[in-house]
Amino acid sequence: APQTVYEWTADVAVRFLKEWNFLLGIILLFITIILQFGYTSRSMFIYVVKMIILWLMWPLTIVLCIFNCVYALNNVYLGFSIVFTIVSIVMWIMYFVNSIRLFIRTGSWWSFNPETNNLMCIDVKGTVYVRPIIEDYHTLTATNVRGHLYMQGVKLGTGFSLSDLPAYVTVAKVSHLCTYKRAFLDKVDGVSGFAVYVKSKVGNYRLPSNKPSGVDTALLRI
């Protein structure tokens, strides 16, 4: 029996939108809210959902580009579809390469964050906290509010004091590591205050391991 050939026409597109318009609207509204309010300083859970959505964009784009290649309307569409497919695959590979390089430098799964390649690293009481930051800041601010420690507005934990803040904070990138030196510390009252860290050094380093090994904890060059 001959196979049925499906053609994507304007009437089919209109009928598809009529049937799926409500569901598509809800999905787009959900994605818009997540992208709008997904920040580490607001909700870590929403931010993780946002990262998952952004991460899924690449494979979805590649699948759609390949679909366009298979079902191209004409040679012009086919040519553009092939170019878009190649570009999407190359950019996705570059993302993985950069993420793996950053993971080698920091050892944190935040290295695979699709939004940024800047990872802020702070060692407090022997625990290294790694959090993503969007921009390359010249200064970083640590705030302690009655034992609640925030770094660039991102909450790290509770039960800390200003004396627990380290002398240095680092921001890891794919190609280098930025070191920030504590330049100012001020106590607002007995249990609250803030510290300002200023960028002082940039080099090709990796973070030292926080496991006890008897070696110097200085930054290790790679």
Curated annotation (Swiss-Prot):
Glycans are attached at residue 9. One of its GO terms (molecular function) is structural constituent of virion. The chain crosses the membrane at residues 20-40, 44-64, 76-96. GO terms for cellular component: host cell Golgi membrane; membrane; viral envelope; virion membrane. It is found in: Virion membrane; Host Golgi apparatus membrane. Residues 41-43, 97-222 are intravirion. PROSITE patterns: COV_M. It is a multi-pass membrane protein. InterPro entries: M_CoV (IPR002574), M_HCoV-like (IPR044362). The keyword rRNA processing does not apply. The keyword Signal does not apply. Residues 1-19, 65-75 are virion surface. It comes from the Viruses. Keywords: Glycoprotein, Host Golgi apparatus, Host membrane, Membrane, Transmembrane, Transmembrane helix, Viral envelope protein, Viral matrix protein, Virion. O-linked glycans consist of Gal-GalNAc disaccharides which are modified with up to 2 sialic acid residues. Pfam families: CoV_M. Component of the viral envelope that plays a central role in virus morphogenesis and assembly via its interactions with other viral proteins. Belongs to the coronaviruses M protein family. Homomultimer. Interacts with envelope E protein in the budding compartment of the host cell, which is located between endoplasmic reticulum and the Golgi complex. Forms a complex with HE and S proteins. Interacts with nucleocapsid N protein. This interaction probably participates in RNA packaging into the virus. This is Membrane protein. It comes from Rat coronavirus (strain NJ) (RCV-NJ).
